[in-house]
């Protein structure tokens, strides 16, 4: 992730900067060398030169210079990040509707079945029982599109209701606490908040600023990617996610303001996500 985070708009990574930033993040030179070797072997980067004098270049296999690239969990989907901030600002109130998705797929199509299940969980839906998932968010268009891609449109059933009961639980907040691991989600955001709230040292230079940006991006993704983005109406208040996202946005503004004009594309990608 450190290597990808330091890719500049022209698709290159300077070896000296990579080793310095990685060192500040606790990585050894040997770990950096092994990481670079793996990325080159996988065809994600080419490299010219050796060690700190090397220049790495992103290949087409790693995606265009304006995108995060396969296997790079740096920037969660911009649309969902913006939705989270709108929720925090009270601009996306819950309408009280639950959205349920059920599917029955034979073992012969196991790979497609697993892919559909992974899509549902990635979109924040929680399993209720075998083949049945539920969420308070209107993710139907995404789920139906994915089912069609997988050749499973006839295997998917969709339903919306204001009357959901799971094992006798009907209260919306109680259902949220039952179906989603809220303490685990909150803990990831608490870690993000702690990192985002740290003040930079007075003598902090550009390399240290880059290291802080990479660490903040990693913590933001670690918290946001598995977050089902439940509406505030279903969450304990104050919610750790809203507090952490506000702190992260403020920290990112500070870091981006001090970043060099030709700095890593990471600043643009996160700037777009938080805009």
Regions found by a protein language model. Give the residues of each.
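Positively charged, polyanion-binding regions of nucleic-acid-associated proteins
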Residues: 1-9
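Short acidic, hydrophobic short linear motifs in intrinsically disordered regions
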Residues: 12-22
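Short, hydrophobic-biased segments on the C-terminal half of alpha helices
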Residues: 33-37, 117
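Glycine-centered, phosphate/nucleic-acid-interacting loop/turn motifs that mediate DNA/RNA or nucleotide
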Residues: 43
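Short, Lys/Arg-rich nucleic-acid/phosphate-binding segment
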Residues: 49-55
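Short, amphipathic alpha-helical interaction segments positioned at domain boundaries
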Residues: 63-98
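Mid-protein regulatory/catalytic core that forms ligand/cofactor-binding pockets
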Residues: 105-199
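C-terminal regulatory/effector modules of DNA-binding transcriptional regulators
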Residues: 170-275
